[in-house]
Regions:
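Signature of N-terminal electron-transfer/Fe-S-associated modules in redox systems
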Residues: 1-167
Length: 167
């Protein structure tokens, strides 16, 4: 295991806290929490990082890969500083998500699963986020849900994030 790919003591402490919620013989139950913590530190989940998580939790690497590749919240390659995920499922699409997604693509100059040349933004297409009544819904960095995202609100968000990103 390459030392630069291991997690910080702070991240390991967070994983240990998640593991403690489960019976001692079920450390693997904390795999989603461990992957999230690893991704928060590294920005994405390299194979080496997933291998480390598997070893730390005492589970086969393939089981970690299955979880990481199944859920859209995990980044399998480097992403921009701001990952914007827009729901394009039918309820959101019926409330303007398709138009909002096209506006995002045009405003950022990229398509889905692409990152801007400056490394600031990555655009993703996401599954239902459970806020259909507030569509179109956008998720920023898997943490902040933004609702009723009109083209005007999208432009405002992009401007704000560009300003923050330049700091």
């Amino acid at each position: 295991m390459n030392a630069p790919l291991m997690l910080s003591p702070e991240s390991l402490a967070k994983i240990d806290k998640a593991v403690a919620k489960y019976p001692p013989d079920r450390k693997d139950s904390a795999v989603m929490a461990a992957l999230t913590i690893a991704q928060d530190e590294k920005g994405w989940l390299a194979t080496e990082t997933m291998d480390f998580v598997a070893q730390y939790l005492g589970m086969p690497p393939v089981a970690v890969y299955e979880v990481a590749t199944f859920y859209t919240m995990y980044n399998m390659k480097p992403v921009g500083k701001y990952k914007l995920t827009i729901c394009t499922n039918l309820p959101c699409a019926l409330q303007g998500a398709t138009h909002a997604a096209e506006h995002l693509k045009k405003a950022l100059g990229i398509g889905f699963n692409e990152t801007t040349a400056d490394g600031c933004f990555t655009l993703k297409e996401g599954e239902c986020m459970g806020a259909c009544g507030d569509a179109p819904v956008l998720l920023q960095n898997n943490k902040l849900m933004l609702c009723a995202m009109s083209p005007e609100k999208i432009d405002e968000l992009i401007g704000k994030l560009k300003t923050e990103g330049a700091k």
